[in-house]
């Protein structure tokens, strides 16, 4: 679904995650992300998600993606979390699938629900950028303000 407000097109799209807001409503609502299409930028915010092939269609539907806010944390142990959260390697693949010009890692290092080491997501992304200079994927300390390029 899409809506336009103040020349910004806002599009909701499904992601792969569970939902619950109360004791008896598990998976009764749709979990998703948002695309913000402005005159200057097309921004994607994925929120919580696992990797899914449905994202391969999103690049075609949403057009050129200038910036993606991509989850990179809360992924270990994989036998539990793989259905709900991408790990950093899947986040990198998803950024490539979406052909995102710039990707920013979110959803890590703040609240510790899972067992991966605190800085592991950031370390994996930094190493991947060294190995692949075409990868434009940044992270920072949670809570810091960033400037959108």
Where are these regions (language model features)?
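Core dinuclear metal-dependent hydrolase active-site scaffold
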Residues: 1-63, 142-149
């Amino acid at each position: 679904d899409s809506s336009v407000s103040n020349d910004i097109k806002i599009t909701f799209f499904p992601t792969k995650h569970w939902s619950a807001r109360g004791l008896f409503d598990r998976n009764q609502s749709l979990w998703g992300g948002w695309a913000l299409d402005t005159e200057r930028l097309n921004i994607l915010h994925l929120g919580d998600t696992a990797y899914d092939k449905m994202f391969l269609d999103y690049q075609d539907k949403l057009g050129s993606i200038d910036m993606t806010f991509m989850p990179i944390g809360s992924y270990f142990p994989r036998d539990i979390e793989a259905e709900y959260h991408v790990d950093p390697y899947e986040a990198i693949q998803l950024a490539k699938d979406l052909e995102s010009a710039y990707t920013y890692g979110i959803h890590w290092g703040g609240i510790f629900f899972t067992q991966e080491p605190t800085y592991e997501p950031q370390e994996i992304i930094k190493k991947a950028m060294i190995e692949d200079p075409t990868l434009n994927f940044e992270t920072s300390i949670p809570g810091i303000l960033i400037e959108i390029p």
